[in-house]
Each structure stands twice: as structure tokens, then as C-alpha cells.
Amino acid sequence: SDRSKPELKNLTFDTYKNLSDRGIDVAIITDHPEITIENLSLCAVMAVKNGMDEEKALKAITSTAAKNCWIDDRVGTLEVGKDADIAVFTDLPTRFESECVMTFIDGKCVTDIK
């Protein structure tokens, strides 16, 4: 039997582009724990591969996602006074070959892949 959620029945990766092109603020999410958070950047990669603007895809996993969750006063952009939770990638996280090499939580390095 099909285990898909009914609300996702017609979702494809070009849905992000179609909504974004119509001026809708799109947040790319993973529905963790159903699809783990580790796949968030892969979802952004797939959205770009299917036509979404790369800058909009990056915002969809950062600032727009924070805005849509009403927490953009704390996270989503790099600004003085916001939480210092940062992931450092080898390239844009919207590119398949990109790897997360460092993670900071509250300004403290918690992961450093060297």
C-alpha cells in the first residue's frame, strides 16, 4: 500500500519553483523525523535541479523558513543579536557536491570535519 501522506500526493520538486515564481514565500522542509533533517540540503539541491532559483532555494532553507515559522527574530540570517547557530559548507548547500564541514551552536564549534 502507498504510505505517502495525502497532502503530499501531488508534490514534486518543481512545485517549489512553481510557487516561488508566483511570488509565494516557499520554505523547504523535510518533515523530520519522517525524512531526516540531514536531507534538507538535498531537498534544496533537488528544487534547484528542477528549476528553482538557487538564491531562493537557499533562502527557503534559511531566512524564509525562519520567517514562515515566526522565529526570524532569532534565526535565519547572520545578524548581530541573533542565535549564532551556523553551518559552514564547502560550497552553497544548494549544490550536490557541497559538504558541511563545521557547525556552530550558540557561537561554539560543535563539529569540525578536517
Where are these regions (language model features)?
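His/Asp/Glu-enriched, well-ordered alpha-helical/loop segment
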Residues: 1, 5-89
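C-terminal cap of metal-dependent C-N hydrolases
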Residues: 79-114
